[in-house]
């Protein structure tokens, strides 16, 4: 019997092929959970749910009504919700002065307001049963990365929301934690990682000598969600030791790519 046998696990942000959400969904399903995947691409959600013998519910994580309806639907269909994971994100790369108000609004809606509403609904849903809440954050909530101000700021904000939930709702049996990956090989990072020079520059910042994988994050998530985990309010640094050092500067990445002949000098 898997350690999540009989448990219902909700994973938001599982509609992109082979992203963190999908890899986590497969890992939880392999360990016995009934996994409900959510996102905006219904065809991909349906295919994943069929693959893992799970369920799917459409959700636009920037809309309060959609988030609340998703959680209500899961409980209506499965009579419980034991684990809830948010892996949504938008890797916006824009210099601070060039960040438009529209981009900022979109980032806040997806990466701060959405998680806030999600947590509001979850504490109401889990207050009589307990449960585990996991937010996928980012090492950049604490470690600087050039031209990612809106992304980093909203991720840092959600880390604090998680601590608020953990502090106030622990007596109700609700545990809330976050995971901070560093640079991770996912569809979102596939294009920049085509640069061997860029990849090498990032890997030089990791004491373990490599960037992360979605499987690394899935392993951490199953631990945090398990009954063996006596942790709440924590931000788990799953980034190969990047948190001990720093990300490369934008100028360092540029110089490395120029030296490798991948891009022309300015």
Where are these regions (language model features)?
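Canonical Rossmann dinucleotide-binding motif of NAD(H)/NADP(H)-dependent dehydrogenases/reductases
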Residues: 2-34
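Substrate-binding pocket helix/loop in short-chain dehydrogenase/reductase
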Residues: 95-96, 100-108, 148, 198, ...
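C-terminal substrate-recognition "lid" of short-chain dehydrogenase/reductases
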Residues: 116, 210-238, 243
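Active-site helix of classical SDR
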Residues: 119, 154, 162
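Alpha-helical segment proximal to the catalytic Tyr-Lys
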Residues: 124, 167-171
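Short C-terminal tail/terminal secondary-structure segment
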Residues: 143, 232-266
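Short, small/polar-rich loop/turn modules that mediate ligand/substrate recognition or access, typified
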Residues: 170, 175, 231-233
